[in-house]
Design a protein with these regions (language model features):
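Intrinsically disordered, metal-sensing/regulatory segments
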Residues: 1-262
Length: 262
């Protein structure tokens, strides 16, 4: 298979995962149970944390290994910038998380559906950045980042997006939308990922010396989403132990993917 074809497939895999998850509205009649939702939120958190550590932060430090103890600086700086960037977007963008009625960000007159879409966009942007930056490293021959490793990140994000797609589309169906509309809205939430990935690839190709910072930046952005959104939702109320089990499974799965394919 040509490298270009592999790149295209790798960039589209996360979107495919979101679409598969969104299609759950055609297979499930009732609203998603609290137990299943907690488990899936924990699983998604585990995949994102493992991808951030094994596929982003560690390669960022390994690329600067010749700097000795200072190799941690790009990873630390990029990580903090990634968290700060998402924090700024979170504060400025009006959005509404699924399962809540209290908007966040700047006040606006946007509809509930529009604010839900913005919340999902904020959530998915770091995942697209993560896929884009590892593919950029593989494309430009960066040390410690192979094409197989990039595919493993894309595959891991795609697997994680399956429950996310369901978590988005099922509540929309329960709110009274048709199955097709719920599926389309859930699927569209994943479009930002290949777009974000392409943007990062183009930027990284121009700024290869900054690649370690960009890897850590994507990791920081993903950690922000996990700590700010996923973990609070997964740990609130009953059945939080299921989210812990889901987290462990997701983390180990992504770790294995990175080691085996990387």
């Amino acid at each position: 298979m040509k490298v270009t074809t592999i790149f295209i497939i790798g960039l589209l895999l996360p979107l495919l995962g979101t679409m598969i998850g969104s299609a759950f509205v055609f297979m499930m009649k009732n609203e998603m149970s609290a137990r299943l939702q907690k488990s899936l939120l924990g699983f998604a958190s585990g995949v994102m944390v493992a991808a951030s550590v094994w596929s982003l932060l560690i390669p960022a430090m390994e690329m600067k290994a010749n700097s000795g103890a200072w190799s941690v600086v790009p990873a630390a700086v990029g990580f903090l910038l990634g968290i700060g960037f998402l924090l700024l977007i979170d504060e400025l963008t009006p959005h509404l998380h699924i399962g809540t009625d209290k908007p966040e960000g700047l006040r606006s007159h946007l509809s509930k559906t529009a604010m839900l879409a913005l919340a999902v966009t904020i959530h998915n942007l770091p995942e697209g950045m993560a896929v884009g930056v590892v593919f950029a490293g593989a494309e430009n021959g960066a040390a410690h980042i192979s094409l197989a490793a990039a595919i493993s990140v894309s595959l891991g994000i795609a697997i994680q997006n399956i429950p996310e797609g369901a978590i988005i589309s099922m509540p929309m169906r329960a709110a009274g939308n048709s199955r097709w509309k719920s599926f389309m809205l859930g699927s569209l939430s994943g479009v930002v990922e290949p777009i974000g990935a392409l943007a990062v690839i183009l930027l990284a190709s121009l700024l290869m010396p900054a690649l370690p910072y960009m890897l850590a930046f994507a990791a920081g952005a993903m950690f922000y989403v996990v700590v700010e959104e996923l973990i609070p939702e997964a740990s609130s109320g009953q059945h939080s132990n299921l989210s812990t089990i889901g987290f462990a499974i997701g983390f180990v799965l992504m770790m294995v993917l990175d080691v085996v394919m990387g």
